[in-house]
Amino acid sequence: MSVTVLSLQSHVVQGTVGNSIAVPVMRAMGVRAWGMPTALLSNHNGRSSVAGIPIDSEQIDAMVNALDSNGELKHVDAVLSGYLTPRTGPAVLRTVERCRALHPDTIWVCDPVMGDMTPDGELRAYVPDETVSLMTDAVQHADVVVPNLAELGILTGTEPRTLDDIVRAARSLTGPHLVIVTSMPYHCLLYTSPS
């Protein structure tokens, strides 16, 4: 039996982020991946020019309601969330709750898309403060959190530079069972449990 993942992320025309890359990769691995857009964008939000079509909570709720009416939502084993906006975040949180109510073992993997490191090594947020607040709350309810180094700093109010800083910051996140930090300047894979 195949694993089913509901992937709630942005879809971009140009680039390999969000559902534009996650869904094809998961499908190639034999996962039943369902891509639901949280934003339709021209490209990655960190670029100098971005255009898009807004998605709101009502549209996400309607798509989730249709999946539920068709008897499909109960098959979701995991929810993967990525780029969220204040308009879509509440619906994504409701979707996770609905999936867990139908299938209590549903895992939520949250990629708190909020920023990146600049070429000169500065941590930079490219989302509004409302989104930072939303993500800070969301990660407390997720099972797995997958921040990049900048996002880890944004979530923890730190500027992790050394491996010890990174481990300390990852362990300070409350809520998730597992924190996987990506895009570190070290040749290792770091994962940690907050406790």
What are these regions (language model features)?
Residues 78-168, 180-189:
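Conserved beta-alpha-beta core of the PfkB/ribokinase-like small-molecule kinase fold
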Residues 27, 139, 174:
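Anion (oxyanion) recognition and catalysis
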Residues 176-178:
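Acyl-thioester C-C bond-transforming condensing/cleaving domain
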Residues 2-110, 114-122:
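Conserved N-terminal subdomain of the carbohydrate kinase-like
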Residues 191-195:
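Conserved small/polar residues in nucleotide/adenosyl-binding loops
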